[in-house]
């Protein structure tokens, strides 16, 4: 039985209008002072654990009472979590600290469906919560013999530099397909049954400049990294992702690479070190370097796109440019989003009334929301590229997170989970037991209507292309059947292409996606450039070397398009970027001749390819 702690925060709530105070988060010029008083609900004589699994905090914000519900983030650390630093003489020191009884929580505000919270309860309460669509921060004031805390808004923190900050990735994403509904981009029923989430094992590296910035206080650095990881973990849940911290390395006796303001150089150097050094010592899926170096220009983060699970490129670099944890954690999640195949948002992407996390310019208001575009691109990457490293289930030495009834996550042993009894809005689910109510066949799923299985034949997943037929309910389950595609190699689009993994890839669509309307497949003569084997014209890469196309394979290298748009007359237009050399290549499965498709940079017979 989880013991519940009730803490009443008595407010001597007086905003200091016009006055300021220096906190860990910076110079704050408008805040409320609160004095937490812990009132335990444990039975008399019971032993109180150091950090409870679940807690409630009652307090007031702007004179209004609120109740903050918190649950320990038991998936924050992997069971084999390790920490490495270096002695003054350069010796590597690795430890495996006990992290089960940690003090990092996620939560929500009672009766506020849009609320979220990420709190450290290690030494007082530190973190942030969202209440009535506004983000508030709470932090101990650290006055002698006082339990005083400050509550304040981000807008009241003085900024050292008001100049706009940006991600260094310069690519934009365009789509020739209509926006897909989130319900159509789901993991198969079999995958959902055993593993509804994807699990990213995150490794954080802290450079020497960060150590200097923190006066060599390794404990302070560790606490900050835990807080950042706790927030990143919370943010990624919007994508049905779970980031567990598997390791932390602090370059306390000098950097292992040369960290420069040049983000291209630093990202590539870190990626190479990760591949040749870190991966040989510690299994992980993704690594991020946090540095106090000031990157060139307004850039504060940089990453490879669509590289999750790659032995070298599943990395990102982030500048620790703000003392506010939420701000830096948002950048970390943004860059990991790039690794997960997400590009920057464009004008047609939406997060409702909130700024989006994947905007190219960092918003003045920290946002934890991914747009509809981000969701689509992430799961499109996962379903098409199938990165294997994030499929491992949270068992054994992986994430330790037992089911918790009432957290609105469907976990092992639960038939449904609609939140707490006071917040549950699912008429099929008993919130107290996380079991279906009597007479209910289901409580969720694309084939569940009014607590009953949908009739057999009801469409539950629309056709997304000629090669992807619609799926229909069976009448025996609440889940939509697994997404089934037509056989690879089946002709499609009036024989202009062949089916490949549910799509019908043709060069016209790929040109449209890269350059927009009035752009078409170029003449055959343009593709001869792919025989050069130079930085852009090649068919494939082997051990880092670009292999020129054989004459019969030229249509399976770089894509060339004819641009007839107003003001343009480019018969051999192509796309190339140092950030993502693969973008602009002809996609696998594309028709390259009658009866032939592209496969690994070769134009081969359909029967051979499939």
UniProtKB/Swiss-Prot annotation:
GO biological process: proteolysis
Source organism of this protein record: Bothrops insularis
Protein's UniProt name: Zinc metalloproteinase-disintegrin-like BITM06A
Chain residues that bind Ca(2+) 1: 201, 285, 389, 392
Lineage: Eukaryota, Metazoa, Chordata, Craniata, Vertebrata
Motif D/ECD-tripeptide, residue range(s) on this chain: 466-468
Function field: Snake venom metalloproteinase that impairs hemostasis in the envenomed animal.
Residue numbers binding Ca(2+) 2: 404, 407, 409, 411, 414, 417
Binding site for Ca(2+) 3: 468-469, 471, 483-484
Disulfide bonds listed in the record: 309-389, 349-373, 351-356, 405-434, 416-429, 418-424, 428-451, 442-448, 447-473, 460-480, 467-499, 492-504, 511-561, 526-572, 539-549, 556-598, 592-603
Enzyme Commission numbers on file: 3.4.24.-
Propiece residue ranges: 21-189
Annotated compartments: Secreted
